[in-house]
Amino acid sequence: MREVTIAAIQMSCSRDVKENIEKAAKLIRAAAEAGAQIILPSELFERQYFCQERRYEYYAYAKSVQENDAVQHFTQTAKELGVVIIVSFYEKNINVLYNTVTV
């Protein structure tokens, strides 16, 4: 049987998307260096968690998979490190919003 090491990352997030992506990147790299092959950052880690309530202003956070900075960044990071990174993001597809996971 093959052994697989999985890392789950729980981190505090700020309102600064770029800062949160950079923080997650450091933690993902540390997990990969420690031997993790599958890495799962916190749910919707790009921002402070906002899903407790439905507010119109949150709809602006949603982006398509192609426009999402975290998805694009961690697609490249996964290739570079040779690991699987599971990224949760708020997706907009036409006029429908999803809490999506991409691998």
Where are these regions (language model features)?
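Cys-nucleophile CN-hydrolase/nitrilase-fold catalytic domain and related Cys-dependent amidase chemistry
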Residues: 17, 29-103
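Active-site-proximal beta-strand elements of phosphoester/diester hydrolases
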Residues: 3-15, 100
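N-terminal phosphate-binding loop and adjacent alpha-helix
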Residues: 10-27
